[in-house]
């Protein structure tokens, strides 16, 4: 039985981390083997707080050993990683990706390098950003950073579309074959912008921006998951990006229309199979937009 190994956070209530990523990939036809880096009652933006705990790096490695014992790693089509709770967890992920690639050289590694955002800066524990930037992102086939995380990896500030394109080119030169910028903040507050870059070209995706009273949590995890599933379907990065962008819009639209804070992943599940709205991609090059 082939599958996707997804190593990231988990919440019992709502949709963030694996709780946001696992079902969409299953709905798109893939078996998913989730390993949780933390397990919380709910996401951490609730003013009432949350309960739960982080797992150790040894917890992750132990589960991977068990999967290896039953021959699962050679059937692993992709490793998807998101939020890591410690520097040690990052090292366990690095070891896991290496083992999976040894067992199945065709397996993809998709790294969502959760570090922070422009308005918050780096929000992860000491050592995590360094391991993401120096170990996990360079070994990944695909990285899915936001603008802040891309700027950290490319070691440059991003203020314009040209900056973003150059940063993606720098990122591609460091090892990844595909860069999907899950949120490009610098262009406009009127639209939500994403960017895809490969050696073959760079594409900009724009969709309407929703004025949520409180921004939903877990949308980035959703983006990474749908894109991963699209690539495993044999779609080109551009095709997977198009589907991912349209499907995520559908989920966010359903969430907005329902007046909910938590992503309406279950109610909007048809979006993962057949998105209800299409937003054409724009191929961009340097100096396309000043």
Curated annotation (Swiss-Prot):
Organism field: Vibrio vulnificus (strain CMCP6)
Coiled coil residues, start to end: none
Family of the protein in this entry: Belongs to the pyridoxine kinase family. PdxY subfamily.
Enzymatic class: transferase
Name of the protein described by the UniProt record: Pyridoxal kinase PdxY
Annotated function: Pyridoxal kinase involved in the salvage pathway of pyridoxal 5'-phosphate (PLP). Catalyzes the phosphorylation of pyridoxal to PLP.
Annotated ATP binding sites: 112, 144, 149, 182
Binding site for substrate: 9, 44-45, 221
């Amino acid at each position: 039985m082939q599958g996707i190994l997804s190593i990231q956070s988990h919440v019992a209530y709502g949709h963030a981390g694996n709780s946001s990523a696992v079902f969409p990939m299953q709905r798109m036809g893939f078996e998913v083997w989730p390993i949780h880096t933390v397990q919380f009652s709910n996401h951490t933006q609730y003013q009432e707080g949350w309960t739960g705990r982080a797992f150790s790096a040894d917890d992750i490695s132990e589960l991977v050993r068990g999967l290896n014992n039953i021959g699962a790693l050679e059937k692993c089509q992709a490793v998807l990683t998101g939020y890591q709770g410690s520097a040690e967890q990052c090292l366990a992920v690095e070891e896991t990706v290496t083992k999976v690639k040894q067992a199945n050289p065709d397996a993809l590694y998709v790294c969502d390098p959760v570090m922070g955002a422009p308005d918050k800066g780096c929000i992860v524990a000491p050592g995590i950003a360094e391991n993401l930037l120096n170990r996990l992102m360079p070994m990944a086939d695909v990285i899915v950073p936001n603008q802040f995380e891309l700027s950290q990896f490319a070691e440059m500030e991003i203020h314009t579309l040209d900056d973003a394109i150059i940063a993606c080119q720098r990122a591609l030169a460091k090892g990844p074959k595909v860069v999907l910028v899950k949120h490009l903040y610098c262009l406009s507050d009127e639209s939500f912008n994403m960017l895809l870059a490969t050696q073959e070209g760079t594409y900009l995706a724009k969709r309407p921006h929703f004025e949520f009273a409180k921004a939903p949590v877990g949308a980035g995890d959703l983006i990474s998951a749908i894109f991963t599933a699209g690539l495993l379907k044999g779609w080109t990065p551009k095709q997977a990006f198009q589907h991912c962008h349209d499907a995520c819009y559908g989920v966010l639209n359903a969430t907005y229309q329902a007046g909910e804070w938590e992503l309406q992943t279950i109610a909007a599940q048809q979006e993962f199979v057949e998105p209800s709205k299409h937003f054409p991609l724009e191929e961009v090059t340097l100096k396309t937009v000043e």
